[in-house]
A protein has these predicted regions:
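Non-catalytic accessory segments flanking enzyme active sites
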Residues: 1, 87, 119-127, 132-145, ...
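Short loop/turn segments that connect beta-strands within beta-propeller blades
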Residues: 4, 58-62, 150-154, 202-206, ...
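Cap/lid segment of the alpha/beta-hydrolase catalytic domain
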Residues: 383-498, 502-504, 511
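Beta-propeller fold detector
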Residues: 19-24, 65-68, 157-161, 209-213, ...
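Predominantly five- to eight-bladed beta-propeller fold
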Residues: 1, 7-9, 91-147, 196, ...
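Conserved beta-propeller blade repeats
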Residues: 27-43, 71-95, 120-122, 132-137, ...
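Active-site-proximal cap/loop segments of hydrolase catalytic domains
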Residues: 25, 461-682
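Structural motif
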Residues: 51-55, 96-101, 143-145, 191-199, ...
Length: 682
């Protein structure tokens, strides 16, 4: 959701404004729509010619013009304020720049030949950033580049001067006067290869200047110029000594070469920074920026999260500018804490928002019982899933409990089974989020509803290490320590105390970090009766050299450490060392092309389970041609099969065969008696 047309709430009336209509049906996919100021034309990306290109369409006449012809399409774009030109990001190979073929679209035949040639090409690797799970594998020599295109003449230009041919550039953004472009670049090699910096160049790509310097830029959304073009707002992860994880808006002053926070990282009464990462909610499509500046330059609007709610806040930039001390270090910012205002909040999950020139706001938001819909002024504009009204859905209860060490208040949620009956006990599943620096929120969870519909309760919560609860809550790598384990067990004990959960029939599951904690819990506690570990991390020592971020650690290698000492440090306390204590039925779900937690991590759990614990039911399901994000964006068949595997496992070992161990012991005794008989006969 890129922007809101001024005409969307014009004189045509409420009913006309709410009328849904299909704007494009030209390609297989269309995305990133942007309404021009006349309310008649719309820019968007369409792959009707094979790759995603920018089109401009007249919504009254349906006439359209293709603006770009990038060889491999456009990843994202932004129109200038005067709507005469656009800046784009595109993926290209070095030889395509050298041979001037960047703007030559390939025919299907040429593309097939090109892909075949690429498949045979050996990978040349010189940098640590050679693979990423989001790329679905290793890079094959491509880079992200930026350039411009004029809407009238369709003239396209690629920025290749001032080292920009060799430096990857992403998320370009126009200044309001159309003379400058801000973007994120990757200037480093080695272990810092994933670190981005903020850059500015002229509209023609000349006069490149680096603006940030190790400020912790989080380059997943475009930077934004202030109204007077004298500053740029970008998001940073502060380099705090306590190791806490909080994303904050930082204003870079282009006139004075200074920078400062725009909100106070110590004031957590309203929000915990900007956009605490949500734990894999039900979302689709490309995301727009989660922060936006008003046209008058007074306010910065941003999405935020606190205590399981995702809300919308704003901060006065001009007040912050006059009342904030200018600093040159990311850790020295001083700001008055009364600047942040809550704009929209409630028992909801605001996933996207857009504003028009009058600062009217449309949101995409969900809640526990409803997937995301469009909302405006407190009214729901769409109803995309009316079929849900035909099903009984389980509601959610929010609870708080004190941590075992008494140092924290813990938030957890409890989902009762559908058709819940009092005075009856039910099995339950503890679901652990990934991250770990994410937050479970009140959004629609199909997985939880599926478990509840089968007669199981669901327990989920935010143990220490989660975002949304302040810096102290997620400081010091606590998510990997005993505190997080204790917190998760505390969730279960608190839920069991409600009286309707059978403590002998509690299962546990989770993905990524949640899979790591699933393994850890069944190895170090006797609380659970069955487990499903998903896309798990098992051995942090081997993940150092196999995962796409294995070398990125919260505990960097001390200079005085030898490599062997470092690997031993990572291996110390590894969860596979507890495999002898894995005494519950275990299902392992893993994608074969997972580049974050490699498939070998699943094998390191499966193999010792079969060797050391042959009497324990253990099964591994591998999903081919899928990556770490399979349950969110994988093939639909695989997503359904993944859910079925998990639910079937818990139905079997928490409901149908909860006495499997007794039967196994009886069978073992019979086998032993038979062997003794054979020995006597022999």
């Amino acid at each position: 959701m890129e922007n809101l047309s001024q005409n969307a709430t014009g004189a045509e009336g409420k009913d006309a404004a709410r009328k849904e209509s299909v704007l494009t049906l030209d390609g297989i996919n269309e995305k990133q729509p942007f309404f021009l100021s006349d309310g008649i034309h719309m820019a968007y990306l369409s792959n009707e010619t094979g790759e995603f290109q920018v089109f401009i369409k007249n919504l009254k006449t349906n006439e359209k013009r293709q603006i770009t012809t990038l060889r491999h399409g456009v990843l994202r774009y932004q129109l200038s304020d005067d709507e005469t030109k656009l800046v784009f990001e595109a993926t290209l190979w070095p030889e395509e720049i050298q041979e001037n073929t960047a703007f030559e679209e390939m025919t299907p035949e040429k593309k097939a030949q090109w892909e075949e040639d690429l498949d045979w090409r050996p990978y040349e690797i010189t940098n640590l950033t050679y693979k990423l799970d989001e790329w679905h594998g290793m890079r094959k020599g491509e880079f992200s580049h930026i350039g411009t295109a004029e809407l009238s003449s369709k003239k396209q230009k690629l920025f290749t001067s001032d080292c920009m041919e060799k430096m990857e550039a992403i998320y370009p953004s126009w200044s309001h006067d159309g003379k400058k472009i801000a973007f994120y670049g990757y200037p480093y090699e080695g272990a810092k290869g994933f670190d981005v910096e903020l850059f500015v160049c002229d509209e023609n790509g000349k006069n490149l200047k680096q603006i940030s310097n190790d400020n912790g830029i989080y380059g997943d959304h475009a930077p934004a110029f202030t109204a007077d073009d004298t500053g740029i707002v970008a998001m940073v992860f502060g380099d705090f000594e306590d190791g806490s994880c909080v994303q904050l808006p930082m204003l870079f002053d282009l006139m004075n070469n200074t920078h400062r926070y725009l909100i106070d990282e110590w004031d957590e009464s309203i929000c915990h920074g900007v956009h605490p990462l949500r734990a894999g909610s039900l979302e689709y499509g490309d995301h727009s920026n989660y922060f936006k500046l008003t046209k008058d330059g007074k306010y910065l609007y941003f999405q935020t999260g606190r205590h399981g709610r995702y809300s919308l806040c704003r901060v006065r930039i001009d007040v912050a500018k006059s009342e904030t001390a200018e600093v040159s270090s990311v850790t020295d910012s001083v700001i008055k804490p009364s600047l942040v205002e809550m704009v929209l909040e409630g028992q909801t999950d605001i996933q996207e928002f857009a504003m028009n020139e009058n600062d009217q706001i449309v949101t995409i938001q969900a809640d526990w019982l409803h997937p995301a819909e469009l909302w405006m002024n407190g009214e729901k504009l769409t109803d995309s899933n009316p079929w849900l009204s035909e099903y009984a859905l389980a509601d959610v209860e929010e609870h708080w409990v004190k941590s075992k060490d008494g140092k924290a208040d813990l938030q957890y949620f409890l989902v009762k089974p559908v058709c819940f009956e009092k005075n009856k006990q039910y099995p339950a599943v503890l679901d652990i989020k990934g991250g770990p620096t994410t937050m479970y929120g009140l959004t629609f969870w199909h997985e939880f509803q599926a478990l509840a519909s089968l007669g199981m309760a669901v327990i989920f919560g935010n143990p220490r290490g989660s975002t949304g609860f302040g810096r102290a809550y997620c400081a010091g790598g606590v998510c990997w320590e005993n505190e997080a384990v204790d917190d998760l067990v505390q969730f279960v004990e608190a839920a069991v105390s409600k009286g309707f959960i059978d403590e002998k029939r509690v299962g546990v599951t989770g993905g990524s970090y949640g899979g790591y904690m699933t393994n850890k819990l069944i190895g170090r506690t006797n609380v659970f009766a069955a487990a499903v570990t998903q896309r798990c991390l098992a051995n942090t020592a081997t993940s150092y050299g196999t995962g796409d971020m294995g070398f990125v650690s919260s505990r960097p290698i001390p200079k005085h450490f030898h490599m062997l000492d470092y690997l031993e440090d990572r291996a110390r306390g590894n969860i596979i060392s507890y495999v002898d204590h894995f005494k519950v039925p275990l299902l392992i779900l893993h994608a074969y092309q997972d580049y974050r937690c490699g498939f070998e991590q699943a094998e390191q759990v499966f193999i010792p389970m079969k060797e050391r614990n042959p009497e324990i039911p253990c099964r591994m399901v591998m999903f081919p041609n899928e990556n770490h994000g399979m349950t969110r964006n994988g093939k639909l068949y695989h997503q359904v099969r993944h859910l079925q595997e998990m639910t079937n496992w818990f139905v079997k070992y928490l409901m149908e065969e909860s006495d499997w161990k007794t039967k196994a012991d009886e069978k073992s005794e019979k086998d032993t008696d038979f062997m003794k008989t054979q020995e006597v006969k022999g």
